[in-house]
């Protein structure tokens, strides 16, 4: 087998491989001889089938196996002899002329093909000196704990049925209703319900809906007209007027919830003090998670600005395709277009291309940093992640577990974010971190990019 490098440009490599006809013939004969020893064909004694007969029957299929084995061998040889780190699977090009391929398959001519691949870049990690990030922290106030306690009390509020002639719905009542909603005279998906409980004044339904039920008598019906908010989550309903035919089936008046130790015991806690401590711990966990999202984004921004290196085009294209498929799926589901977002498809493609490049860059960087630092993910950690994933599919836990166990690539997708978080923590220990106390509103301020890119690089770690 002769291997010649024909291209070395940036991260692109290309090699020409020539397998002499004599080598092909030798490999074919070896396979036929092995088959002859085991072949059982009517009319011939075991092990005595003429090679020529076997070749006539199976020669072409065996030669296909020989060629595939030679291609795999060439790929391994190229990687090992040149100490390459391939970024993805190679592209194999066979002879364009059918006659050439036929001659090679008959071992009458040399078999030549090309192997093209991209390699991973060499990243000079260096030190993280000069990288500084700010970590936002917020304290949990007693008022915040009170809000949660009061919300729990509201959720467990007792209700007493309101019965008799002349009973009408008032604010605070729990109304049980049937309703059918229509837009332009046509019923729409999700616009109907039966036996639905609604606390009037809770703001659970579309603005204006609950207020129009006040004063409605038990058993009576009323037509309610509302307009969906312009920013309604279902874009095809946003800003549209809807008419609901509502029937009041039952009413219940609100009682009072006493917030004491007995109330706390209803939530499995020893007393009210323990309940408040538990609530505080939960809020602190939420704040810590929000803080992590923000400082992680800041750290990734700093790393993205610090490091510049060539990216394998294949990985970028793969990441972009994954992003674009999600964008198209979201548009299809929401009914919104690029014009609705104030942009064009061309501009959106350019923006998402930059995001794909960023994700690949950070993924490759974190992979190299983790490798240099000896970061490992234990099987127990992957199994725990798999357990949590399976729990999110009640009744199908075993099916989910078995799927991941049988699909290494799926398991790798579970492993990647765990590995990434460990590498991020390692880098955090090496950079300068300054804690900054802020109000909870600043810490929890909605930032789509925090959510979008909190785990943005893990795709490139798979």
UniProtKB/Swiss-Prot annotation:
This is Trigger factor. Residues 444-455 have a biased composition (Acidic residues). Consists of 3 domains; the N-terminus binds the ribosome, the middle domain has PPIase activity, while the C-terminus has intrinsic chaperone activity on its own. GO terms for biological process: 'de novo' cotranslational protein folding; cell division; chaperone-mediated protein folding; protein transport; protein unfolding. One of its GO terms (molecular function) is protein folding chaperone. Its main location: cytoplasm. Involved in protein export. Acts as a chaperone by maintaining the newly synthesized protein in an open conformation. Functions as a peptidyl-prolyl cis-trans isomerase. GO terms for cellular component: cytoplasm. Keywords: Cell cycle, Cell division, Chaperone, Cytoplasm, Isomerase, Rotamase. Belongs to the FKBP-type PPIase family. Tig subfamily. It is found in: Cytoplasm. Residues 443-462 are annotated as: Disordered. Its EC number is 5.2.1.8. It is an enzyme of class 5 (isomerase). Residues 172-257 form the PPIase FKBP-type domain. It catalyses: [protein]-peptidylproline (omega=180) = [protein]-peptidylproline (omega=0). InterPro entries: PPIase_dom_sf, PPIase_FKBP_dom, Trig_fac, Trigger_fac_C, Trigger_fac_C_sf, Trigger_fac_ribosome-bd_bac, Trigger_fac_ribosome-bd_sf, Trigger_fact/SurA_dom_sf. It holds the Pfam family FKBP_C.
């Amino acid at each position: 087998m002769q291997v010649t490098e024909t291209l070395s440009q940036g991260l692109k490599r290309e090699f020409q491989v020539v397998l002499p006809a004599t080598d092909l013939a030798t490999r074919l004969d070896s396979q036929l001889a092995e088959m002859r020893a085991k072949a059982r064909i009517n009319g011939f004694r075991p092990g005595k089938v003429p090679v020529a007969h076997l070749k006539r029957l199976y020669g072409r299929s065996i030669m296909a196996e020989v060629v595939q084995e030679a291609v795999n061998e060439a790929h391994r040889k190229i990687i090992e002899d040149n100490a390459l780190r391939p970024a993805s699977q190679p592209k194999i090009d066979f002879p364009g002329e059918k006659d050439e391929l036929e001659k090679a398959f008959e071992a009458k001519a040399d078999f030549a093909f090309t192997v093209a691949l991209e390699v991973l870049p060499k990243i000079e990690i260096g030190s993280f000196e000069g990288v500084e990030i700010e970590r936002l922290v917020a304290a949990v106030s007693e008022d915040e704990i009170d809000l949660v306690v009061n919300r729990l009390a509201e959720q467990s509020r007792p209700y007493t049925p309101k019965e008799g002639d002349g009973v009408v719905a008032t604010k605070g009542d729990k109304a049980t209703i049937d309703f059918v909603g229509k837009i332009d005279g046509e019923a729409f998906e999700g616009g109907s319900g039966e036996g639905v409980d609604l606390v009037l004044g809770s703001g659970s339904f579309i603005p204006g809906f609950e207020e129009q039920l006040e004063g409605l008598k038990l058993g009576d019906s009323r037509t309610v007209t509302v307009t969906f908010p312009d920013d309604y989550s279902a874009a095809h309903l946003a800003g549209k007027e809807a008419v609901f035919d509502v029937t009041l089936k039952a009413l219940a008046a609100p009682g009072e919830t006493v917030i004491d130790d007995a109330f706390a015991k209803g939530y499995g806690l020893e007393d009210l003090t323990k309940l408040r401590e538990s609530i505080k711990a939960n809020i602190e966990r939420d704040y810590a998670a929000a803080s992590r999202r923000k400082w992680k984004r800041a750290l990734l921004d700093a790393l993205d600005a610090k490091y510049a290196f060539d990216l394998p085009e294949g990985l970028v294209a793969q990441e972009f395709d994954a992003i674009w498929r999600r964008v198209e799926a979201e548009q299809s589901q929401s009914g919104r277009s690029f014009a609705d977002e104030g942009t064009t498809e061309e501009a959106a493609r350019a923006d998402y291309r930059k995001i794909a490049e960023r994700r690949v860059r950070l993924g490759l960087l974190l992979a190299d940093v983790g490798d240099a630092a000896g970061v490992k993910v234990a099987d127990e950690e992957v199994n725990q992640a798999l357990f949590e994933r399976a729990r999110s599919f009640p009744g199908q836990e075993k099916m989910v577990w078995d799927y991941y166990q049988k699909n290494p690539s799926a398991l790798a997708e579970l492993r990647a974010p765990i590995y990434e978080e460990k590498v991020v923590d390692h880098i955090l220990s090496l950079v300068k971190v300054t804690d900054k106390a802020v109000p909870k509103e600043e810490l929890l301020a909605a930032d789509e990019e925090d959510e979008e890119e909190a785990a943005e690089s893990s795709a490139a770690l798979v």
